Amino acid sequence: PATSSPGLAFLLATIVEFGEDGGYTWKDYWADLRDNDVTVTAGWSEAYEVRFSGGYGAGDLPLVVSYASSPPAEVLFSEDPIAEAPTGVIEAGCFRQIEFAGILTNAPNPELAGKFIDFMLGLEFQEDIPLNMFVFPANREAALPDVFIEHTIVPENPATLDPAAIDANRQRWIEEWDAVMLP
């Protein structure tokens, strides 16, 4: 979670699902994963491209934490044409990850920066994002490419947390995760 945005998203999803209080908390869940010899890598690339056996990696592990946009990438980049993605999306474990662009307070050209953000939010740019960044567009009017429509889903009820709660607790949660996973 400290070095990977999908890892952090998974940690946050477990906090939403199991909570911090009660008979079985997110820490208990992670302790159970640890006790079951879960493999944690330094980042998404190693996990997906090296260790995962189900995608384009030739690894030894059958499950991986990735993005809802991984199945279309598998279809698009398959060496041999395939009709169905070898990967899927488990909706119950999804956390909506949102990537931002912003203008810094003391930016030397805030007007130009604003125009660039407007450009990035425009339909042409947003419709170009899925097949280049393999993320969903922020502009709801942007059309998705067929490979996205056919090979993935947008989870209807992803886990969410108030951004202020994430900001206030992220470091503590990561430190507590470290204490559970790296005793």
Features from the language model and the residues they span:
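Ligand-binding pocket segment of bilobal, Venus flytrap-like solute-binding proteins
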Residues: A13-A92
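Solvent-exposed loop/turn segments at secondary-structure junctions
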Residues: P1-S5, A68-P72, C94, P108, ...
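Solvent-exposed, polar/charged alpha-helical surfaces in well-ordered, non-transmembrane soluble domains
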Residues: L12, A31, E46, V50, ...
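Short helix-loop capping/hinge motifs at secondary-structure junctions, enriched
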Residues: T3, V16-T25, A107-A113
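Periplasmic solute-binding protein
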Residues: P1-E17, Q97-G102
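Extracellular/periplasmic bilobal clamshell ligand-binding domains
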Residues: D146-P183
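Mature extracytoplasmic/periplasmic domains
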Residues: F95, A101-L161
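Sec-exported extracytoplasmic/periplasmic mature domains
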Residues: I15-E20, R34-V38, S53, G57, ...
